[in-house]
Structure formats: structure tokens, C-alpha cells
Amino acid sequence: MNLPRAERLRSTPQRSLRDSDGEDGKIDVLGEEEDEDEEEAASQQFLEQSLQPGLQVARWGGVALPREHIEGGGGPSDPSEFGTEFRAPPRSAAASEDARQPAKPPSSYIALITMAILQSPHKRLTLSGICAFISDRFPYYRRKFPAWQNSIRHNLSLNDCFVKIPREPGRPGKGNYWSLDPASQDMFDNGSFLRRRKRFQRHQPTPGAHLPHPFPLPAAHAALHNPRPGPLLGAPAPPQPVPGAYPNTGPGRRPYALLHPHPPRYLLLSAPAYAGAPKKAEGADLATPAPFPCCSPHLVLSLGRRARVWRRHREADASLSALRVSCKGSGERVQGLRRVCPRPRGATAPCSSDRQACRTILQQQQRHQEEDCANGCAPTKGAVLGGHLSAASALLRYQAVAEGSGLTSLAAPLGGEGTSPVFLVSPTPSSLAESAGPS
């Protein structure tokens, strides 16, 4: 059947058939060739149908058939022979593989963390160090590493037996340290990590209890903590001065307590007066700060007392009829006791208040002189001498009050006989600055 068509036609003998008349007739070769063509087409179709199941089985199995099977035309009779190597392994192989996996340790996560912390040299570890110890010690957790790391973190945060220790600033690394509470050492029975006695709970301090101070408190701080101090605490600390009790102080000015609404301008103690004060704080306790000298209540009372005495003597001396006081710049020139009005630095006009006081005193003196002239009796020499003595005594009192302050200075008498000595008020720069401040 595989021979060429021309050779088959040549080799095929011509059949001789007799007709009904008995004569030999020739066979039509064309009709035989058509039959052979039909047979050949049918055989070719049969081969294709027989090869199709083999191809489908090969496609199902996922492998290509060799060329010899296709050319031979013989397909496998059982399609189940293909893909046998892709079947699931038997149950015995799966059981043997499970038997090879390591078993889970019987210890809990708290026991594993405690084991990791106790084996460290410093008895503290970070979260990564605890996980590394568990992975190296137990192969079961080595195969399932990412799953149980969160469980370790939660057990560290939720159990009171673990204490977080912050990392030192200069120590390299990341994360805080974890350690065991010293009171939780007997958490497990006889050191066995398989069984825990009870859940450890840290004792919380009561709300009313105060923690002991690591350092002794000063007297003022102790008085604040204890509203009813006993006899051992000693006297309470002196009250601190109020910030708004002093005026704005500048360079070269000394603060003073405003005890009177109109403080004296020239009654201020300078540095030598402070230096001459007795040193009372030599034997005092060094821990108790000494109050500022100008803020001492005794000094303030003494200043107020001296101010009142100074004002009283000033009024008494102003009422003396034997003295004539003239203010510089007032336009009147009379002999006798002369007082110069101090002018602060930078001031352009003379002291108006002192000029007004001088005018008032002059008017009173003129009135007394007119009364004496009306009575017809001139002032005697004794009266003049008494006035001089009263002026000298007043000057001595001024010097006693302002001793060491450099406020007053006695000058040589001006004029001849019968004239009063002249004293000039020469304020220091500090007193000038104080007088320029708010009164």
C-alpha cells in the first residue's frame, strides 16, 4: 500500500472478463484507481483517529510523546500510565516526614524568657537577644521564627516579673534591656521552669505613703512638707521679700524698703556704714542664708525712727526766729545761716520745693521781726547767742544721724562777729541718684 501508484498499476495484471457473448473484454483501469484512492484516504483517516487519543493523553500528562510512537501509530492502551510520577506520595512518607520535625518544648514563654535572662552574664537582655537564645536552644522555634516573636514581646510587656531597663545614652545598639524583678526569683518550683508557683504581681505603693527622700531637705522645704512643724525643726525661715517692694534699681543704686510713703532723700547709709555694722552672722548656721542688710526689720525700724527724729528737728530749727535762711537762686542776700539747695546731676532748674520752703521761712522770720519792732524791743545779744547755740546743737544732731554717710560737712563761718556758722549739704553721688528716683 505504500508503493507508488504507477508501480502498482504496472504490476497489476489486466483481468479479462468475458461478455455475455463469450468474448473477452478489457477492465476499466480508471475505476480501480478510484477505489484504491478511497481505500488509501480511509486508511489515512484511521491512522489519524488512532493517534489522537495518544496525543491527548500526552497532553494530560504534561510530557511530549517520542517521535517513534507517533510514526508507529501505536498509542498507549491505558492513559493512566502517563503522569504517575506526579501523584501525591503515600501516607507512610508523610508520616515519616512529620516524625522528623522537632517537638515543641513543654516550657511556656515566660519560662523561656526567664531562662534566656538568667543565662546572660549581666542578667539582662534585649528582645533580639532573647529571641536569638530561644532559636539557638530549641530547633522547633528555629523553624517557626517570625510567628512567636510577637508572643515574646507581649509576655515581656504584660507580666510584672519582667522589668524594662533603659539603654544608656552612650551605649551603642537599639532597644531597651529586660531583666527579672528581684522579688520574682522564687517564681518557679525548685528552679524548674516546667511549673510556676503563682503569677507574680508587683506591690504598688499606697497613695498616702511618701517615698523617703534620698537627700535631707532644707528647713524651708521641710516646713512646706509638714504644715505643723515640731520643736526639732527650729524657727521658720524669714519671709522672702516681695519682688515689687523695691523700686527699679540701676547701676550704682541700693534698694531700700519703702516703709514710709515719703522716705527721706538724704538719710541713706553708704558703704562705710554697712562695713561698720557688727557681724552677727559669723556664728550663724551656714545653711540658713542671712537676709540682706537693708532688708532687715531692725534696720528698717531704725531708719524710720531716725527719719522721724530728723524731721522733728528740722521743723524745730525752721521755727527759730533768730536764724535767717536764704535759698541760692531766690534773689535775696541776707547774712546768717545759709542753706544751699542741692541740684541733681542733669537737672536744669533749681529745687522748687526747697525754694518754696525757704520763702516760707523768710516770711515767718520777717513777721517775727515786725512784731519785735512793734513792741519796741530789739533782739538782745543773749537772744542771738541762744540762736547760735540752738543752731550748733542742731548741727551736731545732724552729724550724729548722718555719721559716716558724708551728707553734711561743716564749713568755716562766713562774715565777722555776730554771724551764724554756715553748713553746706553736700550729697554723695549715690544720694543724688536716689533723690532723682521716684519718691
Swiss-Prot record:
The keyword Amino-acid biosynthesis does not apply. Keywords: DNA-binding, Nucleus, Transcription, Transcription regulation. Residues 218-232 have a biased composition (Low complexity). CDD domains: FH_FOXD4-like (cd20048). Residues 1-46, 62-104, 204-232 are annotated as: Disordered. Residues 1-29 have a biased composition (Basic and acidic residues). It is found in: Nucleus. Residues 104-198 bind DNA. It comes from the Eukaryota. GO terms for biological process: anatomical structure morphogenesis; cell differentiation; regulation of transcription by RNA polymerase II. Its main location: nucleus. GO terms for molecular function: DNA binding, bending; DNA-binding transcription factor activity; DNA-binding transcription factor activity, RNA polymerase II-specific; RNA polymerase II cis-regulatory region sequence-specific DNA binding; sequence-specific DNA binding. The keyword Secreted does not apply. GO terms for cellular component: chromatin; nucleus. Residues 30-41 have a biased composition (Acidic residues). This is Forkhead box protein D4. It comes from Homo sapiens (Human). The lineage of its organism: Eukaryota, Metazoa, Chordata, Craniata, Vertebrata.
